[in-house]
């Protein structure tokens, strides 16, 4: 129980800006539990997003609501995932060799590719959320809860099936703790997500499409990372959350647009 609680606190310290000042011991068991608890940090974010949406939707336009939801997501993670997105954009779009791309990933400076892709990322997120608010307000409410959970679960999927691009960094430090315990917990999380989707969305085709996409995206992203830099890193994992969110909202928008057309 103690190790589980420590793992939960470590997960929130690492992935969120929730003010946890307590010094948590980093042990093998607490590290494993931390990985298992990643989706819980998404569940809390989902709860905050749903609360904000329900509270302000009677008073604000879809555009302002969408902008506030995106802003809350960024501040909740402290811009951690967005930083990964920017680093990966500069590295992957540089068209350099693998070693140079790894150097660019470690460079704290922001390049032109990072600026351009971040503007596009945030702009398209706001646009898609605004569209979904208008197209399917009921389903959108539940997707706000489910998507952050799925994105953090996809971190576990990448740790299970991927390999580190280098011997240093976040990904390399976490891989030794991806044990059978973590893999079994990942399966339990997927069953929970699947059950919640069927229960809340009440649409079999939508649910099956959603579940298929949250499986395919991390596996596809791992292939991209392997081709570009030989594996994954902390930055690529962060980028997968940002890119994965845009991908899921895009798929959901396409689905509802085709249904209402």
Swiss-Prot record:
Predominant localisation class: membrane
GO cellular component: a single term: plasma membrane
Domain of life: Bacteria
Family: Belongs to the CobS family.
Localization per record: Cell membrane
Any single biological process term in GO: cobalamin biosynthetic process
Entry-linked InterPro entries: CobS
Sequence intervals crossing the membrane: 4-26, 40-60, 62-82, 110-130, 140-160, 197-217, 237-257
Molecular function terms, GO-annotated: adenosylcobinamide-GDP ribazoletransferase activity; cobalamin 5'-phosphate synthase activity
Name listed for the protein in its UniProt record: Adenosylcobinamide-GDP ribazoletransferase
Cofactor annotation: Mg(2+)
Top-rank EC class of the record's enzyme: transferase
Keywords: Cell membrane, Cobalamin biosynthesis, Magnesium, Membrane, Transferase, Transmembrane, Transmembrane helix
Enzymatic reactions: alpha-ribazole + adenosylcob(III)inamide-GDP = adenosylcob(III)alamin + GMP + H(+); alpha-ribazole 5'-phosphate + adenosylcob(III)inamide-GDP = adenosylcob(III)alamin 5'-phosphate + GMP + H(+)
Topology class, membrane: Multi-pass membrane protein
Main function: Joins adenosylcobinamide-GDP and alpha-ribazole to generate adenosylcobalamin (Ado-cobalamin). Also synthesizes adenosylcobalamin 5'-phosphate from adenosylcobinamide-GDP and alpha-ribazole 5'-phosphate.
Pathway(s) it belongs to: Cofactor biosynthesis; adenosylcobalamin biosynthesis; adenosylcobalamin from cob(II)yrinate a,c-diamide: step 7/7
Disulfide bridge positions per record: none
Pfam families: CobS (PF02654)
Coiled-coil spans in chain: none
Enzyme Commission number(s) of this protein: 2.7.8.26
């Amino acid at each position: 129980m103690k190790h589980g609680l420590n793992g939960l606190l470590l997960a929130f310290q690492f992935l969120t800006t929730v003010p946890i000042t307590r010094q948590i011991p980093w042990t093998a068991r607490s590290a494993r539990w931390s990985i298992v608890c990643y989706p819980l940090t998404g569940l809390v974010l989902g709860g905050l997003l749903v609360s904000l949406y329900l509270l302000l939707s009677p008073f604000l336009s879809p555009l302002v609501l969408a902008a506030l939801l995106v802003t809350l997501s960024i501040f909740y993670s402290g811009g951690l995932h967005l930083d990964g997105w920017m680093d990966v954009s500069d590295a992957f779009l540089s068209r350099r060799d693998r070693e140079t791309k790894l150097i660019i990933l470690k460079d704290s400076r922001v390049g032109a590719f990072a600026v351009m892709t971040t503007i596009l990322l945030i702009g398209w997120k706001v646009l898609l959320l605004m569209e979904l608010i208008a197209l399917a307000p009921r389903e959108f409410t539940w997707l706000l809860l489910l998507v952050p959970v799925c994105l953090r679960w996809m971190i576990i999927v990448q740790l299970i099936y991927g390999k580190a691009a280098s011997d240093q960094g976040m990904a390399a430090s976490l891989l030794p703790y991806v044990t059978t315990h973590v893999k079994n917990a990942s399966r339990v999380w997927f069953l929970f997500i699947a059950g919640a989707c069927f229960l809340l969305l009440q649409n079999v085709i939508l649910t099956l499409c959603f579940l298929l996409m949250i499986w395919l995206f991390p596996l596809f992203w791992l292939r991209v990372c392997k081709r570009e830099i030989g594996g994954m890193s902390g930055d690529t994992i962060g980028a997968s959350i940002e890119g994965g969110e845009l991908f899921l909202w895009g798929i959901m928008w396409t689905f509802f647009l085709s249904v209402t057309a």
